[in-house]
Amino acid sequence: MLEKTFTEKTFTLEILYHVGTYENSIHFIFDHASKTCAIVDPAWNADLFIQKITDKGYTLTDIWITHWHNDHINAVDEIAEKTGAKITVGVNETRYLRLRHAVTTVDDNDTVTLGDTKATIINTPGHTAGGICYLLDGHLIAGDSLFVYGAGHCAMPGADASVLFHSMQKFKQIADEILLHCGHDYGSQITTTMADQKSGNPFLMIDNEDDFVRYRNHIHDGSRTYPMQPVSQQALDALL
């Protein structure tokens, strides 16, 4: 596993990459003042995550979920059972979520708080019916809604490429300097600024909804390889 750390005024963001069968990225937010931690989309190895947090002298109090897919939540119940952590999920995602523990729901523009650290909720459905992102100081944790030079598929229950198109319009409004952190390391870089995504991610470069849906559902998978590289407008227009 690869690990990266980003330190801000009120929190430290640590990310474990290439975790488990689908090589997920697991995000830890450590609030400096309260010595509490939130973990985002914990899957595959509950004990490893709990031990990591404990070894740093922090208490795990929160589990933040971006979307319901099993590769992002299969350690949630075990962690909640062992720590009593509160589970947060988007209000429109609960009908797909299969967890034993109760959840707290959030909606667009809500704020979740961890000690002195605050994250703004951005509803970004499309990959799932109720997917959300967490916008912190300088960082966007996007789950699988947006990847480095890519975006989530629309192939499972609740997914809709037309809805995803409108979520992309929200991503375009996020400040250029914000760093993007994704649920999987599929891109040519682990993270980039949103400015880089706006100029090189095809899903943020298509302005017409019909073209976007056609590209997402019928063109993208056959025209790109991993790790995903930035795309020029000229190359994208040729595909459309």
Please annotate each region the language model reported:
Residues H27-F28, N109-L135, Q173:
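Core dinuclear metal-dependent hydrolase active-site scaffold
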Residues I29, D41, H67, I79, ...:
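Divalent metal-coordination and catalytic microenvironments
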Residues T21-E23, S34-C37, W44-T120, S199-D210, ...:
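Active-site HxH/HxHxD metal-binding segment of metal-dependent hydrolases
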Residues M1-T5, H166-L240:
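Accessory terminal helices/loops
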Residues L2-K56, C133-G143, Y149:
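Conserved beta-strand hairpin/beta-sheet module of binuclear metal-dependent hydrolase folds
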Residues I63-I73, N123-A129, L180-G187:
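Histidine-centered catalytic micro-motifs
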Residues I87-V91, A142-G143, C182:
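Hydrophobic residues in well-ordered beta-strands that form the structural core
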Residues F11, N92, D110, T117, ...:
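Well-ordered beta-strand scaffold positions
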